Amino acid sequence: MINKPFSESCEQNKDPILSIIKQYFSEENTTVLEIGSGTGQHAAYFPYHLPHLTWLPSDTIENLQGIESWRQSTNLPNTLAPVTLDVSQTVWPVTSIDYIFSANTVHIMSWQSVESMIAGIRKILKPNGIFCLYGPFNYNGQFTSPSNAQFDLWLKSRNPESGVRDIEAIIQLAQTISDNGPLELINDHAMPANNRILVFQKQTT
């Protein structure tokens, strides 16, 4: 077993995030798909505090071993083995899901990948299902803090296709007319360190 990967930001944000998502991921016998589980820390922590549901971690293949190491260290009965998910692929490993959670992903991805992710979520999320998206966002094209502006510069220095996203663009993607029903923004929670949790609900068609 490899050493478990560790992110200090995941350690710091896990409790603030949990305080929000537990309000929405509340139904018994449901499953949460986590898109972009990264180090696996959230997938090891949240299911312990949400024993009424099953947590399904996912990420690209190079991150699965680290996620699995966290899963095995906690050995929680309601955490499934991580699955490979590349949001740019048209076929996902899940065809229907109750809830979806993703943290610190859309500012790392290219915009094309963000479009693919939102389209995939709209396809697999059940009617009235909830999607919680955590991370930094701009409002009216403006950064909400100097630190977010600096973070955006750092992201773009690593990959010009990355960057802090405009909330209006995310909402537009979520609501664009398609066969799979729109996602309506039902809440926008302020979080520590100039982050947000956007809460979307799948609308019935």
Over which residues does each language-model region extend?
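Class I SAM-dependent methyltransferase Rossmann-like catalytic core
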Residues: 1-27
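Conserved class I S-adenosyl-L-methionine
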Residues: 28-38
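Class I SAM-dependent methyltransferase SAM/SAH-binding core
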Residues: 33, 43-90
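A short acidic, Gly/Pro-enriched loop at the edge of an enzyme's catalytic core
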Residues: 92-100
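A short, conserved alpha-helix within the catalytic core of class I
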Residues: 109-121
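Conserved beta-strand signature within the Rossmann-like core of class I S-adenosyl-L-methionine
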Residues: 128-137
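Short alpha-helix
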Residues: 161-178
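Core SAM-dependent methyltransferase catalytic element
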Residues: 178-181, 186-205
